[in-house]
């Protein structure tokens, strides 16, 4: 059933009741919006395309290469030419990782229509500056940032308009996109248009760990040592994983445990073998992994040794694509 595939490796569905109704609907449409901003990391270019690939035979999937959004957000210095090269890298990476049946669209295609801007204005008229300010974290910005650059207030309205204009039943995104998706659901009621189900995936922590227990720091391509990037070679992955924060007997706030739970175990396709002098451990599911790690049955060094070749294998399709492009332009 569709609902089972939606729930797999998902942090939150808003609402579960609405999602269950989609099992009885034909022609379900969905979208995910991605800002092109350079060389993507394992969460963007491995986890998401592999999750969506499991759904591509059941539903229509739009991948929105959000070039205008990236320009507003000053990604790649706001250079649209560079941003579009980044978008092409994203598209090729997603396809290499298995998402071959999606329809890839550029935001610049959408905004070329007067109907889009009519929808944008109708959306804006049903929001407030206060609500848009609360939504700024979707682009990693604050009110102070927007006070210096008013275009940042346009970003959340565009994201909501994307959802309405594409007329989708499902909006995919990380938990950092929750504000925009909830804004879309609220405005949908006011505009009497389709209210998209929100399917939120997990965010991966920085490999360096978090500085405080209450301060989540996510994996970021802007800090290469915090993330596994798709152009990382085996030696790079080995260095980053071996240096990564990985407290023993603890999975919460453990970036390597998160990669295991949200990337490797769901999408590797085979059991994961942890080599131990006392006898190997075969990991078959997330619950077993968590229990074995928390109990001390798996040590951090043993986990790291097992993860390195699997990560290398899983990013290889996207890495081949990256090697065919001049990545120095993103430096």
UniProtKB/Swiss-Prot annotation:
InterPro entries: aa-tRNA-synth_Ic, Rossmann-like_a/b/a_fold, Tyr-tRNA-ligase_4, Tyr-tRNA-ligase_arc/euk-type, Tyr-tRNA_synthase
Motif ('KMSKS' region): 218-222
Binding site for ATP: 221
Keyword Hydrolase: no
Binding site for L-tyrosine: 31, 155, 159, 162, 177
Subunit structure as annotated in this protein's UniProt entry: Homodimer.
Protein name per its UniProtKB record: Tyrosine--tRNA ligase
